[in-house]
Amino acid sequence: MSAVGSSNPEYVVARVRARRGSLYGDEEYRKLTRMGPAEIARFMEESSYGTEINALGSLHGGVDLIEYALNRNLAGQFDDILDWSEGSLYGLIARYLRKFDAWNVKTVIRGVYTDADQSEIEVDLIRAGEFDDRRIRRLLEADSIDAVVEVLEDTIYGDPLREAYAEYEETGVLVPLENAVDRAFYERLLSGLGNDEPTRQYEAFLKAEVDFRNAANALRLARSGADIDPAAYFIEGGELFTRGSLARLARNLDELVEYIADSQYGDELGPALRELEEANSLIAFEHATDAALLAYGDQLGTIHPVSVTPVISYILAKEREVENIRAIARGKEAGLSADEIESELVIT
């Protein structure tokens, strides 16, 4: 509602907890993995996605209908949370939701890079951040990566993307651009937070998110064997790595895995690290970090039940629900078995 005035966490948390009760659980996911796209859409119509399915049903069908409905519902849910919020609580939530601006920027860049149709790019956009419809439209109309950078010149992504663009032109790979977007988002997210205990705990959660992003980037670089300076992709704000330690560890996969296993995240990520060693599965590791963040958010929401943390915990859980449903729909479209699809889901 407004960043001015006093916060109202009691009211917002109560509304969010009511919404959380309608999220899909294990039983719903198991049912969905055994349905086709049309059945999934009908199932969604009988749940919290009914408004979106009905509104979009005459325009889209199959997996496209599911994806458009998911993204519209997600944006609507988060707009509601902002409408309920006031004061510093509004500011913290709005700042976190700008992650979807970062998502949209990277989605457009990837789409332009692969010469995807505008409609193919648009279906993956989530309009839950700060960017208005006009900027989203300008991004979708950009016909080159340089044009995308130009659209963003007056945002926090402008200067970092312009600097990274030179390296992109030299290498032809998107990693410098994508990491420039992530660094800009997280550095802004972690700046100027409050000093009360709940906010300090929230800051610890954000630092864990940065740690997991740095760990995934380091593992990706270590596995690639590419001659890339890992320090160039370091995101400030976490506690697990320094720029120097990330650069050193990313050159040796075994040392990096051991370092993460011996860290404060070892218990949560241990099984995924073993799978990474045995099956070379980075996806399993990334799923494990997602699950660990969900669990961490839930834990903080219990410790500080009247603060921003239960709200952020719900945002993560809702985002994960959307990703799970999307994975099921796309898996069905690709002809994957129920077991193969279930391996792609993050369920806590």
Swiss-Prot record:
Belongs to the V-ATPase V0D/AC39 subunit family. Has multiple subunits with at least A(3), B(3), C, D, E, F, H, I and proteolipid K(x). One of its GO terms (cellular component) is proton-transporting V-type ATPase, V0 domain. InterPro entries: ATPase_csu/dsu_sf (IPR036079), ATPase_V0-cplx_csu (IPR014272), ATPase_V0-cplx_csu/dsu (IPR002843), V-ATPase_V0D/AC39_subunit (IPR050873), V-type_ATPase_csu/dsu (IPR035067), V-type_ATPase_csu/dsu_dom_3 (IPR044911). GO terms for biological process: proton motive force-driven plasma membrane ATP synthesis. Gene3D superfamilies: ATP synthase (C/AC39) subunit, domain 3 (1.10.132.50), V-type ATP synthase subunit C domain (1.20.1690.10). Disulfide bonds: none annotated. Component of the A-type ATP synthase that produces ATP from ADP in the presence of a proton gradient across the membrane. It is found in: Cell membrane. Its main location: membrane. This is A-type ATP synthase subunit C. Keywords: ATP synthesis, Cell membrane, Hydrogen ion transport, Ion transport, Membrane, Transport. One of its GO terms (molecular function) is proton-transporting ATPase activity, rotational mechanism. It is a peripheral membrane protein.
